């Protein structure tokens, strides 16, 4: 099974698990609305679809790059590079007017230094492979996905957003399987 087929299979499984949960939650929300429960939060279908598409595109792209990237580099290196999304989130958030503490910036510097020592051998950039670059792109896209989720989480139902992400991921992955 190739990386894209694996991604498609994983996404289909997520849909199978999430779809019944979304149906049950929607029915419960509808009953509460009909009972005039003022504490029921309603969500825009359009915003949910938009969030599912954008977050799903990031999730699919990042996951496929990760699946391909891990085939060409060692486990420790791939794990460290992929986990760089943890420090990339505050860096990218900075560009949308979210401030990070000094501790975060020190952590970013340490992580980037670690990335340098893992990927660069003998002071030459020749040690960086295309698989390493795929994993860096993967970390960047996972960071964008997290930032997008943060933006949409306040506006939509989280379970429905997850379902939308996996539907998007499945559609893209299935198309790519046959390309």
Predicted regions and their residues:
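Hydrophobic/aromatic residues within transmembrane alpha-helices
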Residues: 6, 10, 69, 74, ...
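Hydrophobic transmembrane alpha-helices of multi-pass small-molecule transport proteins
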Residues: 18, 100-121, 138-142, 172-173
